[in-house]
């Protein structure tokens, strides 16, 4: 069988894409069905940012939305409270004979953490909105609606759901019979719906989103496919906490770093089959928020920092914070435009290269950031501001504080939360402060006791005339590092 990811002169690692991403949120936090319709309008405005086969099959699109209280009250025939229930959406295994096993796995994992399953259902779809060739490319989505254990709320509930998710993934990603079992999302705040779709097909395809009682206050979307992967519903976006436009050119380095961190903690990272760079970024973000207990904005900034080293406009506390982040976090460099959200915070960030477009508009009712301006017609509603996110910049809305934060405000707010200057000082090791140690004391008896000539040292360190002519001599002459 031919490996389609690398054949002849073709290598999928060099694939590029120009995705469409964005978010829309009601600043008052009120859930309405109209926000879904505005999201559909935004998605219909960017078909050129999605990929489509000659037969009209989209290469991937989806939405992440907050959980609709009104809708899930009807689905469960009960009165639910936000933060006291959750929703899990799953692609089932490719082999229909394994569906019951997969359902039992999910049910068992929920029960282990004390979750109470309220409803298990298949997400209804309208195949008539798709081209005939696209129907066979879609995967059915099974949905679990579950109640939180008594007394478990907030961050503790998020951790319990995360443990449930990890238990499911540990078997789903390592058992050949369960190939295809993939959790789109499992959360007490958000749910993800996606597939091999074109942007204009998302809302009409998922019938839940067309129900008038399906009311939400936040939506973020992605159209086109994850970089460096063959089109498949599981690697379509959004992922669980973010959507990413671009490609992460530091992905290999970031994976090595994550593996090293996991090994130091005596853990093991279990990755889904064919994981894209965007999916890996989302997996890391989940780890930072749930396992390392960082708030979402801090995690995003630490993973994708601005170019701060030579920026004299940043305050000392902000510089100390970013320096501290650099001690433990490998930077994720793109080009990358990132949309992130967890139900209470929704935001957008551009990496320090700044090579992906993000346009913003704020009205009295809404805040939106999208790949292109004018994707939504807000009618006669007064516009408070329009703009764009610059390299290393961000804009997010905090529904708990009922306000938005730009780049400067966000960095200053984060820097004020801890004494990063002291943390950097505590982490720094000064060579002058180290006690003197005799080299002879630690030299093995078999070590070379003589001395190399100067030319011998050149050979030992693989230095030749080319190294001196093009690297060392210019560095000595200019005092700058040769690129």
Task: Give the positions of each predicted feature.
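Conserved short alpha-helical segments that host acidic/polar catalytic motifs at enzyme active sites
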Residues: 1-483
């Amino acid at each position: 069988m031919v490996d389609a990811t690398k054949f002849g002169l073709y290598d999928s690692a060099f694939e590029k894409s120009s995705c469409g991403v964005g978010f829309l949120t009601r600043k008052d936090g009120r859930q309405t069905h109209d926000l879904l319709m505005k999201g559909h309008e935004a998605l219909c405005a960017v078909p050129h940012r999605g990929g489509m086969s000659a037969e009209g099959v989209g290469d991937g699109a989806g939405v992440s939305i907050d959980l609709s209280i009104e809708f899930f009250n009807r689905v469960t025939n009960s009165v639910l409270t936000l933060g006291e229930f959750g929703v899990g959406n799953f692609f089932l295994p490719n082999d229909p004979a394994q569906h019951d096993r997969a359902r039992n796995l999910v049910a068992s994992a929920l029960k282990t953490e004390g979750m109470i399953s309220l409803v298990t259902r298949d997400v209804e779809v309208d195949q008539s909105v798709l081209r005939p060739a696209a129907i066979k490319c879609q995967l059915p989505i099974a949905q679990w609606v579950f109640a939180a254990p008594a007394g478990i709320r907030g961050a503790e509930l998020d951790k319990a759901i995360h443990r449930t998710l990890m238990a499911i993934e540990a078997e789903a990603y390592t058992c050949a019979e369960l190939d295809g079992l993939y959790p789109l999302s499992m959360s007490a705040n958000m749910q993800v719906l996606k597939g091999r779709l074109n942007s204009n097909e998302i809302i009409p395809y998922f019938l839940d989103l067309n129900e008038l009682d399906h009311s939400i206050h936040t939506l973020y979307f992605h159209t086109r496919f994850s970089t460096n992967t063959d089109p498949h519903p599981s690697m379509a976006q959004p992922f669980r906490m973010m959507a990413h436009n671009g490609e992460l050119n530091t992905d290999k380095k970031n994976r090595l770093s994550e593996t090293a961190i996991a090994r130091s903690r005596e853990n093991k990272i279990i990755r889904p089959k064919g994981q894209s760079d965007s999916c890996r970024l989302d997996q890391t973000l989940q780890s930072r928020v749930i396992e390392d207990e960082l708030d979402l904005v801090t995690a995003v900034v630490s993973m994708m920092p601005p170019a701060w080293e030579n920026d004299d406009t940043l305050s000392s506390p902000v510089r100390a914070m970013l320096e501290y982040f650099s001690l433990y976090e490998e930077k994720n460099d793109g080009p990358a435009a990132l949309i992130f959200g967890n139900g209470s915070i929704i935001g957008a960030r551009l990496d320090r290269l700044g090579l992906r477009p993000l346009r913003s508009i704020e009205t009295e009712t809404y805040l939106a950031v999208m790949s292109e301006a004018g994707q939504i017609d807000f009618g006669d509603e007064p516009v408070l501001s329009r703009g764009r996110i610059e390299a290393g910049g961000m804009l997010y809305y905090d529904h708990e504080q009922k306000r938005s934060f730009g780049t400067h405000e966000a960095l200053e707010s984060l820097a004020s939360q801890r004494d990063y200057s002291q943390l950097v000082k505590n982490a720094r090791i000064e060579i002058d402060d180290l006690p003197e140690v005799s080299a002879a004391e630690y030299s093995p008896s078999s070590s070379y006791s003589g001395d190399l000539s100067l030319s011998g040292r050149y050979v030992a360190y693989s230095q030749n005339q080319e190294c001196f002519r093009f690297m060392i001599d210019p560095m000595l002459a200019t005092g700058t590092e040769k690129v």
